[in-house]
Amino acid sequence: MSLPLRRVIPASHLLALCLLPGVSFASDFDTPSDDWNFRASLYGFFPDVGGNVRVPSGGERPLDVSASDLISHTDAAAMATFEVRKGRWGGYADIVSMDLGDSVHGTRSILAGRMPLPPGTSADASLDIEATALTLAGTYRVLETPNTSIDVLAGARLLDASVELKWTFSSDVVGTLRTGRNEVSRTSWDGIVGMKGRTYFGGRRQWFVPWYVDAGTGAADLTWQASAGIGYAAKWGDVFATWRRLDYDFGADRHLGDIDFSGPTLGVAFDW
């Protein structure tokens, strides 16, 4: 798993920045104001991937394939969030771009045994997943205190995903499909509603707990997303780590039945 951030701040410099004296490190974005306020976040997402797709198993019999069965590691995904607020009203945009996948070679058991192979047969297999999720929402601040802010939100999310499975058998057994490929794709627009917020704590309000939750439907039977974690507010910006899950359920009769991404995030945020 590779970290997408190419520039690394030395730990000693980061510590020095975090320990700068000040009355309060809480950002202007989370304090009461009628001015325009902006926040941009850049972070990496390191998810495990699960789900089910339908592929032919050497004939007409459908086969449910768990995406996580083929993935022993994933590439990190790029993620960015932009927020704007004036008074209690605001806007929220989040984009996630993922290119995930792995392969196995010489295995006797493809997909954890869900695709049975004849005796003496081995296989090479690969699974590639490309996905982009874009969330757009309007926000309204329902709670605003010196330590806590909570927004309700309503909007839409787009998921554009493709899953490609390839396999090659190394057996000459009659009736065995030597090579195969199956690709399913899905574009889904769904309406969502949710809430997000931050709570600061510590002597100078330098620590905070960020959280986010939404759910909706549309082209998908159900989509939901949730995240929570901890962060540190410095004078130059914020550092935060969360656990995030993005889940889609398209129904049992779809080629792409469901797909989910869950794992840690690590990033920075800047307010102005």
Regions found by a protein language model. Give the residues of each.
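Cleavable N-terminal export/targeting peptides
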Residues: M1-D35
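Short glycine/proline- and aromatic-enriched beta-strand/turn motifs that initiate or cap beta-hairpins
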Residues: F25-M98, G202
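Residues that define the transmembrane beta-barrel architecture of outer-membrane proteins
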Residues: D34-W36, T74-A78, E130-L134, T148, ...
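Extracellular/periplasm-exposed beta-strand and loop segments of Gram-negative cell-envelope proteins
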Residues: D48-D75, S97-T132, L159-S188, G218, ...
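Transmembrane beta-strand segments that form the barrel wall of outer-membrane beta-barrel proteins
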Residues: Q206-D221, R245
